[in-house]
C-alpha cells in the first residue's frame, strides 16, 4: 500500500493528534441538532429524590409544558388529554437531569430538536390513587385493561436507519424504557400500599425483552407506546406493550420480563 509522503513525517502519536483535530473540526461544522428545550430536574433538591417513592416523584415532578402543549393538539394525544380522561400527565423520568451520569442516553443524546423534541408520559389515575387492580391480572384469561402507562413521543429525522425510516434500535430503547417506567410505577404503588420505606424497595431488573417488528415506522412523526402489566408471579413481572404510528397502526410489539431482587435478610 502506498502511504502519502507527508504522512511518513508523523510518528503514531503525532498522527493521532493530527487526525483527531481534523475530525473535531469536521464534527463542529456539521449541522448537529441542538437541544430544543431545557433539561428538567425532578426536584430542586436532588438529594431528596433518592428518599422518595417513584410514584411520589411522578405525582409531584414537573411535566414538560412544551410537550404537553404539543400533544394536547395532536391526534395521538387527544384520547389521553381530553376530559374526562383516566390518565394524568407525569414526568418521563429518563429525560430528566439526575446530577450524575445516569439516563444520559435519553436526557442528553436523545434530547435534541433532531431526535426527540417532545415526549410526554401518562399514567392511569387509579395507580396514582394506589388502586392498581393487580388482582384482576392473575391469569392470561383476565380481561384486558386500559394501558397502565402511555408514552407519547415525537420523533424527528436524526434517528433513521434506512432513509425516512426510524432505526429499530431506537424503537427497542423506547419500549424498554416505557415498560421499565410501567413496572416501577406499579411496584412503587404496592410499596406505598404496604407502607414500605423507599430504602426497603427491591430493585427491578430487565430479564427478557421479546420485540416483534410488524412494519417500518417513517420519520418524522409521532408514536404512541402503550404498556400493561399482564401478571405477576412472585418476583417476576410480566409486561406487554405496543408502539403505534401517527395512523394508529401497530408497528412494533414487545413482551418483557422484569425480576425484582431477592429481599435481604438482616442477621
List PLM regions with ranges:
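Terminal targeting signals and extreme-terminal segments of soluble enzymes
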Residues: 2-219, 232-267
Amino acid at each position: 500500500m502506498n502511504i502519502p509522503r507527508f504522512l511518513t513525517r508523523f510518528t503514531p502519536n503525532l498522527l493521532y493528534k493530527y487526525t483527531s483535530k481534523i475530525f473535531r473540526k469536521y464534527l463542529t461544522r456539521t449541522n448537529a441538532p441542538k437541544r430544543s428545550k431545557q433539561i428538567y430536574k425532578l426536584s430542586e433538591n436532588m438529594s431528596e429524590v433518592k428518599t422518595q417513592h417513584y410514584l411520589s416523584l411522578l405525582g409531584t415532578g414537573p411535566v414538560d409544558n412544551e410537550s404537553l402543549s404539543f400533544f394536547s393538539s395532536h391526534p395521538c394525544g387527544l384520547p389521553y388529554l381530553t376530559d374526562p380522561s383516566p390518565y394524568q400527565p407525569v414526568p418521563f423520568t429518563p429525560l430528566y437531569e439526575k446530577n450524575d451520569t445516569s439516563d444520559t442516553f435519553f436526557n442528553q443524546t436523545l434530547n435534541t430538536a433532531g431526535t426527540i423534541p417532545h415526549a410526554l408520559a401518562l399514567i392511569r389515575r387509579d395507580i396514582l390513587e394506589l388502586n392498581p387492580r393487580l388482582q384482576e391480572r392473575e391469569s392470561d384469561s383476565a380481561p384486558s385493561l386500559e394501558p397502565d402507562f402511555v408514552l407519547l413521543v415525537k420523533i424527528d429525522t436524526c434517528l433513521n436507519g434506512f432513509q425516512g425510516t426510524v432505526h429499530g434500535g431506537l424503537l427497542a430503547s423506547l419500549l424498554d424504557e416505557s415498560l421499565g417506567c410501567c413496572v416501577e410505577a406499579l411496584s412503587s404503588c404496592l410499596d406505598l400500599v404496604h407502607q414500605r420505606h423507599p430504602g426497603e424497595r427491591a430493585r427491578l431488573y430487565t430479564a427478557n425483552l421479546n420485540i416483534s417488528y410488524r412494519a417500518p415506522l417513517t420519520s418524522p412523526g409521532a408514536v404512541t407506546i402503550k404498556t400493561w402489566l399482564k401478571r405477576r408471579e412472585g418476583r417476576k413481572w410480566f409486561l406487554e406493550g405496543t408502539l403505534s404510528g401517527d395512523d394508529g397502526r401497530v408497528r412494533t410489539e414487545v413482551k418483557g420480563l422484569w425480576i425484582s431482587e431477592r429481599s435481604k435478610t438482616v442477621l
